[in-house]
Amino acid sequence: MSKLDSLFTAALEQAAQRQVRRRLRHAAATPPGRLALDGRTLVNFSSNDYLGLARHPLLAERASLWATRHGAGAQASRLVCGNLDLHEQVEAKLARLKGTEAALLLASGWQANAAVLPALFKAAAAQGEPQVYTDRLNHASLHHGCQAAGVRQIRFRHNDLAHLEHLLAERAGAPGARFIVTESVFSMDGDRADVPALAALAARHHAFLYLDEAHATGVLGPRGMGLAGLAPGGVDLAMGTFSKGLGSFGAYVAGSRALCDYLVNACSGFIYTTALPPAVLGAIDAALDLVPRLDQARATLQGHGERLRASLAAQGIDCGASSTQIVPAIIGDAGHALALAAELERRGLLAVAIRPPTVPAGTSRLRIALSAAHGEAELDQLIEALAAGWRAVRQAA
């Protein structure tokens, strides 16, 4: 028992009253597209394993092989003595695929955004306080990185490039380096940024474009390498993850050689973290071999999204501006979203309810994450369950 347990308990009770308390549930591995949860196998529509690679035999084989050959851990941070040839091999392969001069591995997407942004703003401080323009719906890790650096965010309306350009023009004569920080695919809404237009806007206003590609990597863009590929040379830094479309773990930044060398020297999340272990590197390496060849899987995934969005629209369920494998069923009330998720689970489907503070108040939803591992029969099951479940929730309200 700790000295602050009474405070912790009170906070949990308040969260429960607001219907936003979370609890961990026991999950076990199953074939792609499914999940054993609390001892029951469900069709999984909540996973970020968009291409079904997390259970791909090549990833498992190479992870095992590299661990056997090179050990279970890297033993230290890369600047001390943990910089293996494997790290540089994977970074070189990734840079070739991304079409950038260099790439740098990091431990997670959250760590990348939380640590890379402060490092960038520190370098820019020589020109005065940086101007940091951020999308209002950016991921929490991007906001955290800005807050950790102590910079003021100039927020533009979601995906509204006219508003962004207006804000930039308003401050045209102000000192300080300019940064535009946004996502290519937004994790809770499934919509995408117009990356070529963003890149052109950034060029006009001499702004550094930071693009979070966590939910695009593997799934969208040329060879599945993200939407930055639609604007060659126009994105200054692309951040992405290996834990979603690539089925493994970890994150990266890709950009110029000078940028990556600077981050080796200035990014706390790189400097003070033990390097990724050989098994993880092996899985990443295998995924990078597979992903460029998975055009059919990507086409299947986009087809699933189009079909589901049409079904939700026919049922009167708002799915926002989704155009990707992430399809929100926006319910509004947190209690109704929880009830719909429970109805789906009763019918053998997992689609987790997302509530505040993850999404704004009044926009609670089921975040439906599709996978190329889902078949048409499973999509049929989801569509039927959503229709029946939504009727049941409305009748009970």
Swiss-Prot record:
Originating gene: bioF
Cofactor(s), by name: pyridoxal 5'-phosphate
Catalyzed chemical reaction(s): 6-carboxyhexanoyl-[ACP] + L-alanine + H(+) = (8S)-8-amino-7-oxononanoate + holo-[ACP] + CO2
NCBIfam families named in the record: bioF (TIGR00858)
InterPro entries cross-referenced by the UniProt entry: Aminotrans_II_pyridoxalP_BS, Aminotransferase_I/II_large, AON_synthase_class-II, AONS_Archaea/Proteobacteria, PyrdxlP-dep_Trfase, PyrdxlP-dep_Trfase_major, PyrdxlP-dep_Trfase_small
PANTHER family: 8-AMINO-7-OXONONANOATE SYNTHASE (PTHR13693:SF100), CLASS II AMINOTRANSFERASE/8-AMINO-7-OXONONANOATE SYNTHASE (PTHR13693)
Protein name: Putative 8-amino-7-oxononanoate synthase
Pfam short name (any one): Aminotran_1_2
Chain residues that bind substrate: 22, 139, 358
Function of the molecule: Catalyzes the decarboxylative condensation of pimeloyl-[acyl-carrier protein] and L-alanine to produce 8-amino-7-oxononanoate (AON), [acyl-carrier protein], and carbon dioxide.
Upper taxonomic lineage: Bacteria, Pseudomonadati, Pseudomonadota, Betaproteobacteria, Burkholderiales
Quaternary state and interactors: Homodimer.
Pathway: Cofactor biosynthesis; biotin biosynthesis
UniProt KW keywords: Biotin biosynthesis, Pyridoxal phosphate, Transferase
Known EC number: 2.3.1.47
Signal peptide feature range: none
GO MF term list: 8-amino-7-oxononanoate synthase activity; pyridoxal phosphate binding
Swiss-Prot/TrEMBL GO biological process terms: biotin biosynthetic process
Annotated positions of the N6-(pyridoxal phosphate)lysine modification: 244
Organism: Bordetella pertussis (strain Tohama I / ATCC BAA-589 / NCTC 13251)
Top-level lineage group: Bacteria
